[in-house]
């Protein structure tokens, strides 16, 4: 980064700091009361400044015995002993101010087993609020684990308690939070000042976790008419001399009127401050429009869904992603856009203008200078932003005996999937939903139904996956039955996707019958007559011919008998030749044998020289022999 750029950045930072310090100068210290019950001679009531960490016992009180950590024991290190009083009461530990963070003192006190910690001021001054330390790895290890109440007491009161303990007196105190928050009527009004930046580390994570965890409580209170919740977002404005600078342009909308710090504190990388302001404005408009539609509690759904689906960490923090969340929750997008207006216009935005005015405290209400800040009945909440701790504070804001049931029961459950399916995907036809109700709210997660896993984002899509997917609503694919015939675009041979069956065309989600006759894709042979049918076609040939579908041709049905005649003639000719050959063979064989016999006999019977005549017949012997052999 160049020196010029560094200088401009520093100048802008200082200018913004002066603006903030000039506007936000009045911080209200929220208090509890501390009463000395024993010794009776010391009975009196004092104020204590509630710490902005731990868990104040709003609406209640604590009576305990006091112990002192000791001179020079600042509680900056773990105590090597536990503090046990003489009587079976909770222990209230006094620790001197100084040397380390307030929260670390209270943490070490909590580790030693005490029920509450009072930090004794070492300066004679008005009470101040003990705040959490700056974000650091060391502080983050214990700050969220603080579960006990703590407060700062003034220098004079602390010395009074120490002197009594030094004399061996048993000191019993009552710390009372019952009047720490106003409780005028049967409805509690509370506000949460936050922002949409999810890249600011543990503090941003704390805010988002609170919204997710408190959503169930908040929606029950809002739907029942027990509370009136309003979200708020801190913005600054750019000094007039810097409006045209690149820094102001990257951090502000509406010509420098509404600004937020760069989330990465790097003007050349990642998201800009104006992206934060723009989403802050959208979330304000979501609440405004939802409230006009008597659905103000939907703000909690939008914020949690936006964080899940459109986070900066996943590089999805965008207008397009936000609008998809709006539509999934059934909110009128056009009205929200109208509420947002044009962020580039050189005009005031009425919504953000009102936010800047509310940041400045009026009357008994202090300025909003810390994020997050929770305000209950116009008084700032002190303590960690945790579901049960905040619920207890809100419940303490009801007029006595008007508390709703949620304040009287430790268990709470609401089925958020019953309304608009929780903004999740659902298939009404097969009664399958991605909405799962949990104690902390609902989640959108594709289900497993009858052994079939659905896959998708759970918000806009879930599709059955695997070999058995067609058993559930045909895998989400097209399917239709006509005249006893059923066709489907789902195939169990494929683990996903839809494909129209033969005879149909489309994307698988919708399929239409193909008119093979009209498209001339079949039955185009000579003499063929084509008739379209649902899922196929019928082709008939003229005359006595038969249609062959694979070859798209017709053949003669009588052709089989005509074809056999030549074969028969040939076979008959072959048979005749065989018979004739056999007869000729027999004749030739006999003639050959006769000649052979005659030749043999002629050697032994000279027939010509002995040509005698038989007296009985008148024939010669030679003639008789020939007749005999020929017989």
Curated annotation (Swiss-Prot):
Lumenal topological intervals: 26-563
Primary location recorded for the protein, binned into one broad class: membrane
Region (Disordered): 610-631
GO biological process: protein transport
Compartment annotation: Membrane; Golgi apparatus membrane; Cytoplasmic vesicle, Clathrin-coated vesicle membrane; Prevacuolar compartment membrane
UniProt note on tissues of expression: Expressed in seedlings, roots, leaves, flowers and siliques.
Positions of glycan attachment: 294, 431
Chain ranges of the PA domain: 57-165
Motif Tyrosine-based internalization motif per record, residues: 604-607
Matches recorded under Gene3D superfamilies: 3.50.30.30, Laminin
Ranges per topology, Cytoplasmic: 585-631
Similarity field: Belongs to the VSR (BP-80) family.
Domain notes: The tyrosine-based internalization signal may be involved in trafficking at the TGN.
Its job: Vacuolar-sorting receptor (VSR) involved in clathrin-coated vesicles sorting from Golgi apparatus to vacuoles.
Protein name in UniProt: Vacuolar-sorting receptor 6
